[in-house]
């Protein structure tokens, strides 16, 4: 697999379209950080780590409202292996006028675009969610 982040986002997107309550994804430190940001921003209910060693998986519990509509309507990869996208702190765009979130990889780790702008650090824009 050449792009594990795109694979993670696709698994989440497929689980949402199939109305699953949870999705299992092979674990890595980067995927755990993305799951943490999704939870902090309120897009997923929770996530847990299952298994040991190389068999570890991240189980993400998806969030739906009373009508069965997912809190995630759009989930897209921005920077990809063939076309990296780097932005300074002032260049990081607001997603849907602040209703969405960018996931940015900075020198201080993964954070939301809002946090990166607040701390005045730029980085690689990995994904966009709303």
What are these regions (language model features)?
Residues 1-130:
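Core subunits and conserved enzymes of cellular information-processing
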């Amino acid at each position: 697999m050449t792009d594990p982040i795109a694979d993670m986002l696709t698994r989440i997107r497929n689980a949402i379209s199939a109305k699953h309550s949870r999705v299992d994804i092979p674990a890595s430190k980067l995927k755990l950080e993305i799951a943490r940001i999704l939870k902090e921003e309120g897009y997923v209910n929770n996530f847990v780590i299952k298994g040991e060693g190389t068999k570890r998986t991240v189980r993400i519990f998806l969030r739906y409202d009373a009508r069965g509509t997912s809190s995630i309507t759009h989930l897209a990869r921005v920077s990809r292996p063939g076309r990296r996208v780097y932005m300074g702190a002032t260049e990081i765009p607001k997603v849907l006028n602040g209703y969405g979130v960018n996931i940015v990889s900075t020198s201080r780790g993964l954070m939301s675009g809002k946090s990166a702008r607040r701390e005045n650090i730029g980085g690689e824009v990995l994904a966009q969610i709303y």
